[in-house]
Amino acid sequence: MQENVLEPIETLVVTFFEHPVLAARVKDGSIYMAISDLCEAAELNYRAQLRRLRADQDLKDGVQQVRLPTPGGLQAQYCLLLEYVPTWISSVDRARASDLVKERLRYLRRHIIREVYVSITQAAGLPTGQSRNIEDLRDLE
Protein backbone atom coordinates (compact mmCIF):
# COMPACT_ATOMS: atom_id res chain seq x y z
CA MET A 1 0.00 0.00 0.00
CA GLN A 2 1.38 3.37 -0.97
CA GLU A 3 1.15 6.31 1.41
CA ASN A 4 1.73 9.20 -1.01
CA VAL A 5 -1.41 11.19 -1.78
CA LEU A 6 -2.53 11.12 -5.41
CA GLU A 7 -4.13 14.07 -7.14
CA PRO A 8 -7.19 13.27 -9.25
CA ILE A 9 -7.44 14.51 -12.81
CA GLU A 10 -11.18 13.79 -12.85
CA THR A 11 -13.86 13.00 -10.27
CA LEU A 12 -17.40 11.80 -10.65
CA VAL A 13 -20.12 10.81 -8.22
CA VAL A 14 -21.50 7.39 -9.14
CA THR A 15 -24.41 5.51 -7.59
CA PHE A 16 -23.80 2.32 -5.60
CA PHE A 17 -26.73 0.75 -3.75
CA GLU A 18 -28.65 3.98 -4.35
CA HIS A 19 -25.96 6.00 -2.53
CA PRO A 20 -23.46 8.47 -3.96
CA VAL A 21 -19.87 7.22 -4.14
CA LEU A 22 -17.05 9.46 -5.27
CA ALA A 23 -14.86 8.00 -8.02
CA ALA A 24 -11.55 9.58 -8.98
CA ARG A 25 -9.31 9.03 -11.99
CA VAL A 26 -5.63 9.66 -11.30
CA LYS A 27 -2.80 10.57 -13.65
CA ASP A 28 -2.01 6.98 -14.74
CA GLY A 29 -5.67 6.44 -15.68
CA SER A 30 -6.53 4.26 -12.68
CA ILE A 31 -9.91 4.79 -11.03
CA TYR A 32 -10.29 4.81 -7.26
CA MET A 33 -13.49 4.72 -5.19
CA ALA A 34 -13.83 6.50 -1.84
CA ILE A 35 -13.85 3.77 0.82
CA SER A 36 -15.92 5.86 3.22
CA ASP A 37 -18.65 6.25 0.58
CA LEU A 38 -18.57 2.54 -0.29
CA CYS A 39 -18.90 1.66 3.40
CA GLU A 40 -21.79 4.04 3.89
CA ALA A 41 -23.60 2.59 0.87
CA ALA A 42 -23.10 -0.97 2.12
CA GLU A 43 -23.86 -0.10 5.76
CA LEU A 44 -20.36 -1.11 6.87
CA ASN A 45 -18.15 0.41 9.56
CA TYR A 46 -15.58 2.55 7.75
CA ARG A 47 -12.79 2.24 10.34
CA ALA A 48 -13.18 -1.52 10.62
CA GLN A 49 -13.20 -1.97 6.83
CA LEU A 50 -10.17 0.30 6.35
CA ARG A 51 -8.31 -1.76 8.98
CA ARG A 52 -9.31 -4.96 7.17
CA LEU A 53 -8.24 -3.62 3.78
CA ARG A 54 -4.89 -2.36 5.06
CA ALA A 55 -4.21 -5.68 6.83
CA ASP A 56 -5.17 -7.89 3.88
CA GLN A 57 -2.10 -9.19 2.06
CA ASP A 58 -3.66 -8.64 -1.37
CA LEU A 59 -6.27 -5.91 -0.95
CA LYS A 60 -3.84 -3.50 0.72
CA ASP A 61 -2.20 -3.00 -2.69
CA GLY A 62 -5.41 -1.35 -3.91
CA VAL A 63 -5.66 1.13 -1.02
CA GLN A 64 -4.42 4.62 -1.82
CA GLN A 65 -4.95 8.11 -0.48
CA VAL A 66 -6.43 10.48 -3.05
CA ARG A 67 -7.04 14.19 -2.50
CA LEU A 68 -10.79 14.57 -2.97
CA PRO A 69 -13.22 17.46 -2.74
CA THR A 70 -15.18 17.63 0.53
CA PRO A 71 -17.44 20.31 2.02
CA GLY A 72 -14.32 21.50 3.90
CA GLY A 73 -12.15 21.67 0.77
CA LEU A 74 -9.72 19.17 -0.73
CA GLN A 75 -8.72 16.43 1.71
CA ALA A 76 -6.79 13.17 1.45
CA GLN A 77 -9.18 10.24 1.68
CA TYR A 78 -8.55 6.53 1.53
CA CYS A 79 -9.78 5.03 -1.71
CA LEU A 80 -9.83 1.57 -3.21
CA LEU A 81 -8.71 0.81 -6.74
CA LEU A 82 -11.82 -0.05 -8.75
CA GLU A 83 -10.48 -3.47 -9.75
CA TYR A 84 -10.21 -4.44 -6.06
CA VAL A 85 -13.79 -3.49 -5.13
CA PRO A 86 -15.38 -6.83 -6.19
CA THR A 87 -12.96 -8.90 -4.10
CA TRP A 88 -13.41 -6.62 -1.11
CA ILE A 89 -17.21 -6.61 -1.45
CA SER A 90 -17.28 -10.40 -1.66
CA SER A 91 -15.22 -10.69 1.53
CA VAL A 92 -17.26 -8.47 3.86
CA ASP A 93 -19.30 -9.89 6.73
CA ARG A 94 -22.94 -9.25 5.91
CA ALA A 95 -24.24 -10.21 9.37
CA ARG A 96 -24.92 -6.64 10.54
CA ALA A 97 -26.26 -5.28 7.27
CA SER A 98 -29.93 -4.63 6.59
CA ASP A 99 -31.84 -7.29 4.68
CA LEU A 100 -31.77 -5.14 1.54
CA VAL A 101 -27.99 -4.66 1.68
CA LYS A 102 -27.47 -8.35 2.50
CA GLU A 103 -29.38 -9.30 -0.63
CA ARG A 104 -27.44 -6.83 -2.77
CA LEU A 105 -24.10 -8.06 -1.42
CA ARG A 106 -25.20 -11.65 -2.00
CA TYR A 107 -26.15 -10.82 -5.60
CA LEU A 108 -22.77 -9.17 -6.21
CA ARG A 109 -20.87 -12.06 -4.63
CA ARG A 110 -22.69 -14.62 -6.79
CA HIS A 111 -22.00 -12.51 -9.89
CA ILE A 112 -18.30 -12.36 -8.96
CA ILE A 113 -18.22 -16.13 -8.51
CA ARG A 114 -19.77 -16.66 -11.96
CA GLU A 115 -17.37 -14.24 -13.65
CA VAL A 116 -14.30 -15.81 -12.05
CA TYR A 117 -15.55 -19.26 -13.05
CA VAL A 118 -16.00 -18.11 -16.67
CA SER A 119 -12.47 -16.69 -16.69
CA ILE A 120 -11.04 -19.95 -15.37
CA THR A 121 -12.91 -22.08 -17.90
CA GLN A 122 -11.81 -19.83 -20.75
CA ALA A 123 -8.17 -19.88 -19.61
CA ALA A 124 -8.27 -23.67 -19.33
CA GLY A 125 -10.10 -24.16 -22.64
CA LEU A 126 -13.06 -25.80 -20.89
CA PRO A 127 -16.69 -25.60 -21.96
CA THR A 128 -18.43 -22.49 -20.75
CA GLY A 129 -21.51 -22.67 -18.60
CA GLN A 130 -21.97 -24.76 -15.49
CA SER A 131 -19.48 -27.43 -14.48
CA ARG A 132 -22.02 -30.12 -15.40
CA ASN A 133 -21.28 -29.19 -19.03
CA ILE A 134 -17.81 -30.77 -18.66
CA GLU A 135 -18.44 -34.30 -19.89
CA ASP A 136 -15.00 -35.78 -19.27
CA LEU A 137 -13.16 -35.02 -16.04
CA ARG A 138 -9.90 -35.50 -17.93
CA ASP A 139 -10.67 -32.13 -19.53
CA LEU A 140 -9.64 -30.63 -16.18
CA GLU A 141 -6.05 -31.85 -16.59
Predicted regions and their residues:
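Major-groove DNA-recognition helix of helix-turn-helix-type DNA-binding domains
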Residues: 19, 46-74
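Positively charged, aromatic-accented nucleic-acid-binding surfaces
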Residues: 1-44, 69-141
